[in-house]
């Protein structure tokens, strides 16, 4: 779910500004020694005191050529990486607390990726959005072939935009967890903002039946697109983690509220059908299935996603298994995306069969 992605970024921003490992004297001495011994280009370290720097005689390794060329690991960043693990192993041997560096736990590179499990689970999150894209694209083609372009098409197009934003966001997340650079971080943040806006746009248009009024729907879509453009411009002119998080959380919370309201709206519509006798006794099980699919599922999505956020709030890390709470959180967001698109399809089919609003 999209608010979950935003909360993840919020926690990351907080950790970046207060990672205790960055300020360890031994970590600083280690990076100085590595840059000096390896003669790193663009390094400002021209001398280290062998009497005070305990790392002066350590043999540091050269950056693997594949990492250097494909993943942009230069000498300085590789020294930072090596020293993180030198210090971490030393602290483990001394039975001291493992510290974060630059807002991240000290992960070992696996196949060149900085955070292997977060990368894998981000790719896993891409799949339900891609599957949703395929399903909604098929519906659009079928309705186009049947020349049934009507107000329902607007609703499906809105859901298609959500899938595209989701694919972009999780692609950016995969790249960011594979290699943390300024550009990959910014793209991760930008597309997270796009997901909350497209989700808000689609659910709000559905709940208000805006798709029945094409001109109003077009104006609303243009307004949301303008908001996103201004959001990116604001960050380009003056990057602010605080502003970015407030923006994303605002629209993310609105999404959750709208999902709950849509659930209530569907419930009242189903109850109205029941009172009108549209659900006979023999078909009561059908009524219960509809209640579950159209009313219970969206509320479950909100509850499950909110509960899973505790993985971010109560962070933990296993150096032995190279996995942390953030990676497990990405694992927990795969199922809600599958279910969300199934809900969109069920709701779309239900509205198409019964003109209730």
UniProtKB/Swiss-Prot annotation:
The keyword Ribonucleoprotein belongs to this UniProt entry's keyword annotation: no
Highest taxon listed in the record's lineage: Eukaryota
Signal peptide coordinates: 1-21
Topological region Lumenal: 23-113, 177-189, 234-248, 315-324
Any GO molecular function: hydrolase activity, acting on ester bonds
Biological-process GO terms, alphabetical: GPI anchor biosynthetic process; intracellular manganese ion homeostasis
Keywords (A to Z) from UniProt: Endoplasmic reticulum, GPI-anchor biosynthesis, Membrane, Signal, Transmembrane, Transmembrane helix
Coiled coil ranges: none
InterPro entries linked to this entry: Per1-like
Main localization (coarse): endoplasmic reticulum
Membrane topology: Multi-pass membrane protein
Subcellular location: Endoplasmic reticulum membrane
All ranges on the Cytoplasmic side of the membrane: 135-155, 211-212, 270-293, 346-357
GO CC annotations, alphabetized: endoplasmic reticulum; endoplasmic reticulum membrane; fungal-type vacuole membrane
Transmembrane segments annotated in the record for this chain: 114-134, 156-176, 190-210, 213-233, 249-269, 294-314, 325-345
Pfam family, one: Per1
Matches recorded under PANTHER family: PER1-RELATED (PTHR13148), POST-GPI ATTACHMENT TO PROTEINS FACTOR 3 (PTHR13148:SF0)
Similarity comment: Belongs to the PGAP3/PER1 family.
Function statement: Involved in the lipid remodeling steps of GPI-anchor maturation. Lipid remodeling steps consist in the generation of 2 saturated fatty chains at the sn-2 position of GPI-anchors proteins. Required for phospholipase A2 activity that removes an acyl-chain at the sn-2 position of GPI-anchors during the remodeling of GPI. Required for efficient transport of GPI-anchor proteins.
Extra information: Present with 3050 molecules/cell in log phase SD medium.
The name this protein goes by in its record: Protein PER1
Species annotation: Saccharomyces cerevisiae (strain ATCC 204508 / S288c) (Baker's yeast)
